[in-house]
Amino acid sequence: MMIFILIIFTLAILLILFNKRAVPVFLYHQVNPISSSVSPEIFEEHLKIIKKYNMETITISEYYNKNINKNSMLLTFDDGYYDNFKYVFPLLKKYNM
């Protein structure tokens, strides 16, 4: 299952690179080791793929207030779960996002 998710994520990034008009939004809910959502390890693999393909993560404000390059994307985290702070925030800092 993990390999399948990584393949789909990589294909989505590659499709984005060839579509100059789209700004994709990747929506996450829980990111933790015990949920049925994404584990921190899988989320980190997603961030590595984003870096590998030189994607730029932007905020909603940046989306509305500046010219967006073709490699821009949004990462969103719904519902304000504590695991977003515990697991996601340190990984985003680690990868300068």
Question: What name fits each language-model region?
Answer:
Residues I3-M97:
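Catalytic alpha-helical scaffold of carbohydrate-active enzymes acting on polysaccharides/glycoconjugates
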